[in-house]
Amino acid sequence: MGSTESPLLGQTTPNSVISTTLNDLSNWARLSSLWPLLYGTSCCFIEFASLIGSRFDFDRYGLVPRSSPRQADLIITAGTVTMKMAPSLVRLYEQMPGPKYVIAMGACTITGGMFSTDSYSTVRGVDKLIPVDVYLPGCPPKPEAIIDAIIKLRKKVAREIYEDRTKLQQGKRYFTQNHKFRVGSSLYTGNYDQKLLHKSPEPQSESTSEILSKTFESTSEIPSDFVKYENSVSFQESRNEEYFVKSNEQEINFQKFHWKC
């Protein structure tokens, strides 16, 4: 009577059983399905967009671009990060489920680039806001360099241990928006002294005509370099009128003099 055992049992069993740990299985599943959140603020994002085409085909690495941070575990910062965009970047990173990773793409993201010398609104390094796992220099980096950065990130994910990942999550690795406010001293509210607001102006001692009379009291004509500011409306209305200033002996006609600025 023949045996009921399969003749191929001894040949297929060693090749169909894999001995592994739960940690390695989790790492393998995560590195094979990295879902990136595209955070492009400048020209570096154009190079990443070229990966979607058939020439590079980044789908072979399991990358599926997502528009929501709650469905992504990888954020790629491509371009300049300004002070105004920094809170939104931190907020997006906080909304991503852990474990999460960051790739800093381009010189402007890593160090601020050409804007880091004299710009008051550029963040000089995105690692001051969120933790960075892979730095990708270039201005801009080529698509082949982006693929190399993804491969390096996959190797990092494959070597991770659950205990180490838990310790990193407990520590303060990045800037957070969960500030703790404290009660400070009372500030100056701007209640000015009413006496200063309603203070009447000091009366003028002499009028303009009196000043002119004293100035040209001893002369019979006005100097040629005497000028007048003529950009006001009153000058346009009264340019054809005659102005007289009474002196001690005669009247001086101001119309014959050319008024210029």
Swiss-Prot record:
The UniProt entry, under PROSITE patterns, shows: COMPLEX1_20K
Q: How is the cofactor bound?
A: Binds 1 [4Fe-4S] cluster.
* GO MF annotation list: 4 iron, 4 sulfur cluster binding; iron ion binding; NADH dehydrogenase (ubiquinone) activity; quinone binding
From which residue to which does any coiled coil extend?
A: none
GO cellular component terms listed in the entry, alphabetical order = chloroplast thylakoid membrane; respiratory chain complex I
Annotated residues that bind [4Fe-4S] cluster are located at 43-44, 108, 139
Reported EC number(s) for this entry are 7.1.1.-
Catalyzes what? a plastoquinone + NADH + (n+1) H(+)(in) = a plastoquinol + NAD(+) + n H(+)(out); a plastoquinone + NADPH + (n+1) H(+)(in) = a plastoquinol + NADP(+) + n H(+)(out)
A GO term (biological process) for this protein?
aerobic respiration
What membrane topology was assigned to this protein in its record? Peripheral membrane protein
Per the record, the major location class is plastid
Keywords attached to this entry:
4Fe-4S, Chloroplast, Iron, Iron-sulfur, Membrane, Metal-binding, NAD, NADP, Plastid, Plastoquinone, Quinone, Thylakoid, Translocase, Transport
Q: Which InterPro entries match?
A: NADH_UbQ_OxRdtase-like_20kDa, NADH_UQ_OxRdtase_20Kd_su
| Location within or outside the cell | Plastid, Chloroplast thylakoid membrane
**CC cofactor:** [4Fe-4S] cluster
Query: Partners and quaternary state?
Result: NDH is composed of at least 16 different subunits, 5 of which are encoded in the nucleus.
| HAMAP family noted in UniProt | NDH1_NuoB
Q: What does this protein do?
A: NDH shuttles electrons from NAD(P)H:plastoquinone, via FMN and iron-sulfur (Fe-S) centers, to quinones in the photosynthetic chain and possibly in a chloroplast respiratory chain. The immediate electron acceptor for the enzyme in this species is believed to be plastoquinone. Couples the redox reaction to proton translocation, and thus conserves the redox energy in a proton gradient.
Q: Which family does it belong to?
A: Belongs to the complex I 20 kDa subunit family.
Q: What is this protein called?
A: NAD(P)H-quinone oxidoreductase subunit K, chloroplastic
Organism name? Cycas taitungensis
